[in-house]
């Protein structure tokens, strides 16, 4: 069992880190090509990315969990979950496409951009929103391939799509001189690579996933999303945090402060990806064991996942405390002293929260995998919306920028109590 856990988790960690490099690569190359204005524009529109990924995650992961559990129970209706998930993603994507075509400038302004930032970010926003169906469907394909016993292919899909993004970020932004538009194109095309790689498994004889046509059903969508909601909130919480923090930081420190937060937030994406890797690597195993009634095995996977998250959190905090100046300098091409000061202190304070966040991310995924929706939903709402918003406003009012950075660890600490209570209720 330990070997199986290591196989699934290690491959999912690599895959999720690869996915996080979508934004990190954009941040790095944009900082070199456009400077702090580009980072600010990117950070303001990140919540839109988060929303797109969150919807794809909720539908994809939720449908994949229902598929595995029902398939193991012998329910033939499970065969239409894949088609149903893709169909809903495409239908929902139309909303994002229309916004991207007609009002990307208004969207950037609504998210806090002034006239200079709107001019910098509107074309970037338009381009990536036009490719929304591919982002969402990539998440669905990856979740089903992973849950169908092919984590290696799922990992390769995310890694190679991210590698494409990084390479073409450079090519389009520098040799071809396309600037922000080049970064958007590279990021927008990369999920197509992921989908094509997933098709290697989906079109093979080993694949048990069927593309059986189904009429779109709101009832079935909600049923799938009930167990995918923790994945939704795990993704969307980053967007909510970004919007709240941007609003507060614009008031406290202006555009330079938002650029500093961009460094902190985008670096933290890699950390979140590590914990999502543990969570999503554990989830297929737990869903499988749970569907077969093997509760002892579920408990063993749970313990290994929690210990892994604590170990990774400790290593992350040690790394950031030691190398915060170096991490900041990578994104500070203009050598702005204020940006460096804000970002270095922000990294050190913000990252302490991953001791608790790791447990919360892993715990939420496990609760969803065993269909314990109540606690998974409560924890997701607490960490993604309620606690982080309350602490951000309260601590920033009391301690300024230091309070902004401390809001994340405070919110994760409070949420951890819900997760621990939910896991204890399972009596594994």
Residue ranges and their predicted role:
Residues 36-47, 121, 125, 184, ...:
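Small-residue hotspots at the loop-to-helix junctions and early N-terminal turns
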Residues 27, 100, 143, 169, ...:
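Structural signal for membrane-spanning alpha-helices in multi-pass inner-membrane proteins
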Residues 21-40, 108-115, 171-178, 239-266, ...:
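Helix-terminus/linker motif at the lipid-water interface of multi-pass membrane proteins
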Residues 1-34, 47-62, 66, 90-97, ...:
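N-terminal transmembrane alpha-helices
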Residues 39-98, 135-154, 260-324, 357-379, ...:
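Small-residue-rich hydrophobic transmembrane alpha-helices
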Residues 7-26, 127, 138, 161, ...:
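Transmembrane helical elements of multi-pass membrane transporters/channels
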Residues 60, 127-146, 154-165, 183-198, ...:
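Short runs within selected transmembrane alpha-helices of multi-pass transporters and secretion channels
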């Amino acid at each position: 069992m330990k070997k199986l856990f290591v196989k699934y988790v290690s491959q999912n960690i690599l895959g999720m880190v690869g996915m996080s490099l979508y934004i990190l690569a954009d941040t790095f190359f944009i900082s070199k090509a456009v400077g702090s204005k580009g980072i600010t524009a990117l950070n303001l529109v990140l919540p839109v990315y988060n929303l797109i990924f969150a919807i794809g995650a909720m539908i994809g992961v939720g449908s994949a969990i229902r598929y595995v559990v029902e398939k193991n129970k012998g329910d033939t209706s499970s065969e239409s979950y894949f088609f149903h998930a893709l169909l809903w993603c495409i239908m929902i994507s139309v909303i994002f496409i229309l916004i991207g075509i007609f009002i990307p400038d208004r969207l950037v302004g609504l998210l806090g951009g002034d006239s200079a930032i709107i001019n910098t970010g509107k074309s970037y926003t338009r381009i990536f929103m036009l490719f929304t169906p591919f982002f969402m469907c990539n998440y669905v394909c990856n979740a089903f391939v992973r849950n169908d016993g092919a984590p290696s292919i799922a990992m390769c899909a995310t890694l190679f799509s991210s590698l494409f993004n990084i390479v073409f970020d450079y090519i389009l932004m520098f040799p071809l001189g396309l600037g922000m538009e080049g970064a958007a194109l590279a990021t927008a095309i990369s999920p197509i690579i992921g989908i094509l790689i997933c098709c290697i498994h989906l079109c093979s004889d080993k694949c048990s996933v069927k593309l059986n046509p189904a009429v779109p059903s709101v009832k079935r969508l909600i049923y799938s999303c009930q167990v995918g909601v923790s994945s939704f909130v795990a993704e969307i919480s980053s967007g909510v945090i970004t919007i709240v923090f941007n609003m507060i930081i614009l008031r406290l420190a202006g555009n330079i402060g938002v650029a500093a937060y961009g460094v902190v937030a985008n670096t933290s994406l890699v950390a979140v990806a590590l914990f999502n890797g543990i969570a999503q690597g554990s989830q297929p195993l737990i869903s499988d064991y749970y569907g077969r009634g093997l509760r002892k095995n579920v408990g063993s996977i749970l313990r290994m996942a929690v210990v892994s998250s604590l170990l990774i959190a400790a290593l992350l905090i040690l790394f950031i405390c030691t190398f915060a100046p170096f991490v900041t300098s990578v994104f500070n091409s203009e050598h702005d002293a204020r940006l460096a000061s804000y970002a270095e202190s922000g990294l050190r304070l913000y990252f302490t929260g991953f001791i608790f966040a790791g447990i919360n991310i892993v715990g939420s995924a496990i609760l969803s995998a065993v269909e314990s929706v109540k606690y998974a939903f409560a924890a997701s709402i607490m960490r993604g919306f309620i606690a982080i918003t309350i602490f951000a406003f309260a601590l920033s009012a009391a301690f300024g920028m230091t309070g902004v950075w401390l809001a994340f660890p405070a919110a994760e600490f409070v949420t951890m109590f819900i997760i621990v209570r939910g896991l204890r209720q399972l009596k594994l």
